[in-house]
């Protein structure tokens, strides 16, 4: 049974990775995930923006970044520009404002293509985990053939469950992109 829980944990990790990737897609609405992973050169090293500042949503099209150290404002602005996210930071004293532009139809279509590609990659990862798990089950000499078949069926049920969740996340994001 421990191999089944290991398989489920691996599949959950693959789903979470997909979910994080999808959250960072720009939909035209302000979302802290757009800039959280931007790297900024400060203190002689590079750090993630989420470690340097508080990121909040001012309204549906604007993010406000409040650095923990006001001296990092210009470095944060430069980091956002360098990240090439098509976002323009606006420094106002000790905060940075980012207006999120309305996406064009062409951009939306491109993001939907990326979303579908990432969705398929996540499903492939889930299926690879299933294959690894089934291979381990077949190599386990302690299990009878019937037990192996039963476990394979449970692994397939897990695979179906996680693939369905990926499809649901994809549909939600596509709907969000289409409604802009």
From Swiss-Prot:
Main location as per UniProt: cytoplasm
Single GO term (MF): ribosomal large subunit binding
Question: Protein biosynthesis as a keyword?
Answer: yes
Q: Which Pfam families match?
A: RRF (PF01765)
Q: List locations, semicolon-separated.
A: Cytoplasm
The record's listing under InterPro entries reads:
Ribosome_recyc_fac (IPR002661), Ribosome_recyc_fac_dom (IPR023584), RRF_sf (IPR036191)
GO CC, one annotated term: cytoplasm
Role this protein plays: Responsible for the release of ribosomes from messenger RNA at the termination of protein biosynthesis. May increase the efficiency of translation by recycling ribosomes from one round of translation to another.
Q: What's the name of the protein? A: Ribosome-recycling factor
């Amino acid at each position: 049974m421990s191999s089944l829980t290991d398989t489920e944990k691996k599949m959950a990790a693959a789903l979470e990775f997909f979910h994080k990737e999808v959250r960072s897609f720009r939909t035209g609405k302000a979302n802290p995930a757009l800039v959280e992973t931007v790297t900024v050169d400060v203190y002689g090293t590079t750090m993630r923006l989420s470690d340097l500042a508080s990121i909040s949503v001012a309204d549906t099209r604007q993010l406000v970044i409040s650095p923990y150290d006001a001296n990092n404002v210009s470095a944060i602005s430069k980091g956002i520009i360098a990240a090439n996210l098509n976002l323009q930071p606006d420094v106002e004293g000790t905060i940075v404002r980012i207006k999120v532009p309305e996406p064009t139809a062409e951009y939306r279509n491109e993001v939907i293509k990326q979303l579908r590609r990432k969705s398929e990659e996540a499903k492939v990862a889930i299926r690879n985990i299933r294959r690894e798990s089934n291979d381990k089950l077949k190599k386990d000499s302690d299990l009878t053939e019937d037990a192996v078949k039963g476990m394979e069926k449970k692994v397939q049920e897990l695979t179906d469950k996680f693939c369905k969740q990926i499809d649901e996340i994809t549909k939600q994001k596509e709907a969000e992109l289409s409604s802009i």
